[in-house]
């Protein structure tokens, strides 16, 4: 029985594929935060938030494995959106 060496190709293609979901996530998150800051009505804000989250979830489901999808969705989309949501609620009550 002879062992065979299988060459492994670590090129820029693997790096760019792993960075693409992160760049898409940051772009979607940044644009959604900018849009949500300028929206003052709660119903419109909620609609924009839901549509943004759905778009974001679809992108992550297409581009990442499940664990990375879950962790990055929490850290890049839900937490900033929740902070903005709390800020808008506090400013509307004052």
Curated annotation (Swiss-Prot):
Q: Which keywords, in A-to-Z order, does the entry hold? A: Early protein
| Superkingdom, taxonomy of origin | Viruses
InterPro entries from the entry?
Papilloma_E5_alpha
| Family according to the record | Belongs to the papillomaviridae E5 protein family.
Protein name (Swiss-Prot/TrEMBL)? Probable protein E5
Taxonomic source organism: Pygmy chimpanzee papillomavirus type 1 (PCPV-1)
Upper lineage is: Viruses, Monodnaviria, Shotokuvirae, Cossaviricota, Papovaviricetes
């Amino acid at each position: 029985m002879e062992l065979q060496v299988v060459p492994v190709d670590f090129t820029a293609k693997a790096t760019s594929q792993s960075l693409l979901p992160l760049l898409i996530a940051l772009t979607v998150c940044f644009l959604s935060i900018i849009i949500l800051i300028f929206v003052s009505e709660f119903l419109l804000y909620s609609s924009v938030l839901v549509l943004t989250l759905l778009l974001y979830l679809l992108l992550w489901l297409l581009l990442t494995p499940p664990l990375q999808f879950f962790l990055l969705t929490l850290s890049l989309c839900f937490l900033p959106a929740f902070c903005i949501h709390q800020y808008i609620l506090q400013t509307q009550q004052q």
